[in-house]
Each structure stands twice: as C-alpha cells, then as structure tokens.
Amino acid sequence: MDTLKITEKRGANYILLELGGVISSYTFSDFREKAYTYIQENNLVVDLSNVQSIDSSGLGVFMATFNDGIETGRVFYIMNPSVEALNAINSTGFTDTFNIIHSVTEVV
C-alpha cells in the first residue's frame, strides 16, 4: 500500500514539510490538514525531493494551499521537486504559478 511520510521543521519565517512517498487520494489527508493549517500562520515550504508520485488529489492540495497563501499574505513554496513530482506539476499547466525553490534560504 502507498504511504506518505511527513517530517515537520520550523524556520524563522517558514514551516517546512518534508514529504516522502506517494501523494494520492489514499495518503493526502494528513498532508492536506497540515498544509491548510500552516499556511494560515506562516510561509509554507514543501520539500518534494523524495516524492515518488502525485495524483490529482495532491495537486488539488497544492492549488488550494497556494490560493490560501495569497488570501492570508503567506507564500507557498515547492522545494526540490523530484522528476516525478515536477512532471505532475507540469501536467497542470501551472508550473510558472508556483514558487519553486532549491533551498529554504530562498524563502522571503
């Protein structure tokens, strides 16, 4: 069965969620809850370097979190997407919309 591991870290001006595994309709609920909560209080960075795949459920969380960030004056960042994660993001046509970074030092 697919799993999604989430590790949380906090920086001065961001919350980092390191994700590993598969983001799918079977695994996304904990990620969704954390993303929707944390974007209300701080900038949110999701590290996708260890993500094996993302389905439409996961992409929907990205879009909603991005929009919530705009509404609250916070920024949603995607950091180091794996090839599989980047392909899924590219498939949406919103690649240029997301803030894709390589390091948390790029968080403003």
Where in the sequence are the language-model features?
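STAS-like cytosolic regulatory interaction modules
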Residues: M1-Q52, F66-V108
